[in-house]
């Protein structure tokens, strides 16, 4: 399997892991659809109110506080990039530890009642050196 296919496979596994953790309050799987004029979350109109957080730029001990600040401002979603040049600095060597632990960040968002909108790299529009 070439490097590109390994990377695509890993991204798909990450997406499946994130989605498998998404449950509504009753414990059953939720739904997200595009309605005629709005998004529908579990069959009800849903407006995405999103803030963007660059988890790799914030010390881990401040992650939850930043998520809570976004929620206090009325947001319901956190947009995050997967900064791929941080997670795979050398071909085939992946780092999702410490400040790079994107899954831990997603779990904190979920714990605080927030949704995640994941935008995988390699390109990120945030003044980030490739």
Annotate each PLM feature.
Residues 28-62, 67-77, 82:
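An acidic-aromatic substrate-binding cleft motif
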Residues 9, 31-32, 97:
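Generic detector of short alpha-helix boundary/capping microenvironments
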Residues 5, 15-30:
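Bacterial Sec-dependent signal peptides at the C-terminal "C-region" and cleavage site
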Residues 63-130:
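Aromatic-lined substrate-binding rim segments of carbohydrate-active enzymes
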Residues 12:
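The two-metal-ion catalytic cores of nucleic-acid processing enzymes
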Residues 1-9:
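Bacterial N-terminal signal peptides that target proteins for export
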């Amino acid at each position: 399997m070439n490097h590109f296919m390994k990377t695509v496979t890993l991204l798909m596994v990450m997406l499946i892991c994130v989605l498998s953790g998404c449950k509504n309050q009753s414990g059953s799987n939720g739904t997200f659809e595009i309605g005629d004029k709005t998004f529908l979350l579990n069959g009800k109109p849903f407006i995405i109110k999103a803030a963007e957080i660059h988890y790799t730029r914030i010390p881990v001990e401040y992650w939850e506080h930043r998520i809570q600040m976004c929620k206090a401002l009325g947001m319901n979603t956190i947009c995050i990039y997967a900064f791929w040049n941080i997670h795979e600095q050398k071909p085939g060597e992946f780092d999702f530890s410490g400040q790079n632990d994107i899954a831990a960040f997603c779990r904190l968002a979920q714990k605080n009642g927030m949704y995640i909108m994941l935008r995988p790299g390699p390109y990120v529009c945030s003044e980030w050196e490739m």
